[in-house]
Amino acid sequence: MLEGIEREAAEHSNGCSGPAGHAPPAGAPRHDWTVQQAVALHDLPLFELIDRARAVHRAFHGEHEVQLCTLLSVKTGGCPEDCAYCPQSSHYETEVGPERMLDVGAVLAAAERAREGGSTRFCMGAAWREVKDGPAFERVLDMVRGVKALGLEACCTLGMLTDDQARRLKEAGLDAYNHNLDTSRKAYKSIISTRTYDERLVTLRNVRRAGITVCSGGIIGMGESIADRCEMLVELARLDPHPESVPINALVRSPGTPLESLPPVDPIEFVRMIAVARVMMPRAMVRLSAGRTELSRETQLLCMYAGANSIFYGDRLLTTPNPGQDEDRALIEKAGLQPMAPAAARAAR
């Protein structure tokens, strides 16, 4: 039975049937993946899985390009949500306390530094459960306009959005909105109680209807099973169209959060997750996100070979550490990779 599932997964994964990597993927992306098929794909011998993912990547993306994205927390801490992984939650005693929202000038100065450092996308995050109309949202709209004026792609992650708020963000020039599913529907209940899984999907629908591109992925290493990880990717791959961006995070075990004592993510499992995401969502930008400080340079490069074509660039991701710009620049140069140009980044979305 497993062989049949593997064969079906291979034939419909936008890879051709037959030896992996010897024929280009063809046809429209699938939206009918099953968890069983995704698990079978995940469980292939590692090199076969990577070969299949690489063939898909070659067919849809530049082989040696990586997009550099910068993420800034514009409103830190004091979040009313109880996400078990997050040091910004007001439910836990962590090193991150509530801070005032940044002003527009400070955000645009950070965006200009990001552009000078080579980033082509600038994402602004706020520790909110949902966007509320009022001065804070108006400030975010001004931030988006300013980031666009700098020639950068503008992205936000602000929590739940209504249709009207999504429309206003689009009118301000927003390119992308991040709203992660985090994990599978089953595992989600043990991670978050203050927002439902379906509420997340509604926000993604509102973003899509406004004409903003969707950025949605998840976190591995929160105690979930392999099937849970694959189920999360299936949820994303069943969206039509697929998300334009799929960030894959490894849990950052923040002191004071309920998940601080969990073991680190196995690097090979992280590579597998990247490869499966690439096969299932061939046109998406697959982004190496939080947790890279615990991955070796070699693991990060293997992830890029397996289909990751974007990294978050800068020494912090919201409130968590990230490799420094000099370190990332050296890694990219040593591997012979090229930072993706803005025009190429837009064409690849």
From Swiss-Prot:
**Keywords for this entry?**
2Fe-2S, 4Fe-4S, Biotin biosynthesis, Iron, Iron-sulfur, Metal-binding, S-adenosyl-L-methionine, Transferase
Where are the residues of the annotated region Disordered? 1-30
Quote the PANTHER family the UniProt record gives: BIOTIN SYNTHASE, BIOTIN SYNTHASE, MITOCHONDRIAL
Q: Which family does it belong to?
A: Belongs to the radical SAM superfamily. Biotin synthase family.
Question: Which pathway does the UniProt entry assign to this protein?
Answer: Cofactor biosynthesis; biotin biosynthesis; biotin from 7,8-diaminononanoate: step 2/2
Source species, please? Sorangium cellulosum (strain So ce56) (Polyangium cellulosum (strain So ce56))
EC category name: transferase
Q: How is the cofactor bound?
A: Binds 1 [4Fe-4S] cluster. The cluster is coordinated with 3 cysteines and an exchangeable S-adenosyl-L-methionine. Binds 1 [2Fe-2S] cluster. The cluster is coordinated with 3 cysteines and 1 arginine.
Name of the protein this chain belongs to? Biotin synthase
Domain called Radical SAM core: residue spans? 64-283
Q: At which positions is [4Fe-4S] cluster bound?
A: 79, 83, 86
Purpose of the protein: Catalyzes the conversion of dethiobiotin (DTB) to biotin by the insertion of a sulfur atom into dethiobiotin via a radical-based mechanism.
Cofactors (names): [4Fe-4S] cluster; [2Fe-2S] cluster
Gene Ontology biological process terms from the UniProt entry: biotin biosynthetic process
Taxonomic superkingdom: Bacteria
Residues the record lists as binding [2Fe-2S] cluster: 123, 155, 215, 287
Subunit relationships: Homodimer.
Pfam annotation, one family: Radical_SAM
Per UniProt, what is one GO molecular function of this protein?
Answer: 4 iron, 4 sulfur cluster binding
The catalytic activity of this protein is classed by the Enzyme Commission as 2.8.1.6
Q: Which reaction does it catalyse?
A: (4R,5S)-dethiobiotin + (sulfur carrier)-SH + 2 reduced [2Fe-2S]-[ferredoxin] + 2 S-adenosyl-L-methionine = (sulfur carrier)-H + biotin + 2 5'-deoxyadenosine + 2 L-methionine + 2 oxidized [2Fe-2S]-[ferredoxin]
Feature: compositional bias, Basic and acidic residues: 1-11
